[in-house]
Regions:
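Predominantly flavin-linked oxidoreductase catalytic cores and closely associated redox partners
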Residues: 11-156, 160
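Short, function-defining helix-loop hinge/capping sites that tune catalysis or transport
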Residues: 65-68, 200, 206, 248
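Generic detector of well-ordered alpha-helical packing
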Residues: 7, 58-59, 193, 199
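Active-site-adjacent segment of FAD-dependent monooxygenases/related oxidoreductases
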Residues: 1-4
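FAD/FMN-dependent oxidoreductases across multiple families
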Residues: 134-218, 224-235
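FAD-dependent flavoprotein oxygenase/oxidase catalytic domain
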Residues: 109-110, 122, 128-133, 142, ...
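Short secondary-structure transition/capping segments
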Residues: 70-73, 126-135, 202-206, 265-284
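C-terminal helical "tail/cap" subdomain of flavin- and related membrane-associated enzymes
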Residues: 217-309
Length: 309
């Protein structure tokens, strides 16, 4: 499903005039020669070079420039692991909405959560995310491992009771990533190529789109001959929104944000402001939960903890 979506996006970009070259890999990058220079390797082993006035790295989890230019830095997040698959879901629960993503929290270990993303063809992407230590003692068979987590979570088990598990599960570990810098001479990093926080709330999509929009605006001015400052006009404002997301991701795993989300007497206007952030408006400084995320979330969590549920 994701491959079909990615190909659709790529085809639409090609229709707009973008030159997309499949089956080729960037194996070297030189940004010290005035103009960025890339060395490309084709599937048959032949190589060629491409130079440019500027490079934008949108390679996502491939993180091409961070790897080639030694820009990778350790993430501050604990090492977490995801195990996931696609199933023929056969969901017949009356309350299940196929137009929405279902996020489920483990009933006793709140830092374990599941996603269920229904597709239009009767299939669903199902996955679990947990800290590495929660996998200790579980089956090394990924299908059995995933289903053991689901079996411990009755609400999700009911949703997937009729599922046909016909696709081998896969795993991804230590996916959170960071970099030493978001830009350098002749290049800037976009989206997950720069920093990936966590799959919860799908912040990666928002950060990818926002970083691309911001970088394109700065680069356009630079190519027009203006003097620009990539640090103050791109890196710092981008980081403010990323740090807002970081606050809510950290709060999710700590349980404080879950206290807010799951509180039965939540105020509609507060839900709207928080939902706005998760929908992508993490740079809207008029929203108090953006301008002061840590203080506001802590205050709200304290209120939820003292009010009767």
């Amino acid at each position: 499903q994701r491959a079909d979506f990615d190909k659709l996006l790529a085809d639409q970009a090609a229709l707009q005039g973008v030159d997309i070259r499949y089956g080729e890999s960037v194996i070297a990058a030189d940004v010290d020669a005035g103009k960025p220079l890339l060395t490309i390797e084709r599937e048959d082993g032949s190589r060629y070079q491409v130079d440019a006035d500027f490079m934008l790295d949108a390679s996502g989890y491939g993180r091409v420039l961070p790897r080639l230019l030694d820009l990778e830095a350790p993430s501050n997040f604990p090492v977490r692991q995801a195990v996931f698959t696609h199933v023929e879901d056969r969901i017949d629960c009356a309350h299940f909405d196929r137009n929405k993503i279902l996020v489920t929290t483990h009933p006793t270990q709140r830092d374990i959560w599941f996603w269920s993303i229904p597709f239009s063809n009767g299939r669903t992407s199902v996955g679990v995310v947990a800290a590495a230590e929660h996998f200790a003692g579980r089956s090394e068979n990924l299908d059995d491992c995933l289903r053991s987590f689901i079996d411990e979570t009755p609400s999700l088990q009911r949703v997937l009771a009729n599922a046909v598990w016909d696709t081998p599960a896969r795993t991804l570990s230590g996916y959170s990533a960071n970099v030493k810098t978001l830009h350098g001479p002749g290049f800037a990093l976009l989206g997950n190529a720069a920093e990936f926080l966590d799959p919860v709330f799908s912040s990666g999509v928002t950060i990818a789109m926002r970083s691309a929009s911001m970088a394109a605006a700065v680069l356009h001015r630079q190519l027009q001959g203006e003097t620009v400052d990539w640090q103050t006009e791109f890196a710092e404002p981008l980081k403010r929104g990323v740090d807002t997301f970081r606050c809510y991701v950290e709060g999710w795993y700590a349980g404080t944000f879950q206290d807010v989300i799951y509180h039965p007497e939540s105020k509609p206007h507060i839900r709207r402001m928080i939902s706005s952030i998760l929908a992508g408006y993490a740079w809207d400084e008029t929203n108090p939960f953006v301008s002061e995320p840590k203080r506001r979330l802590r205050m709200l969590s304290d209120i939820c903890a003292t009010e009767p549920a």
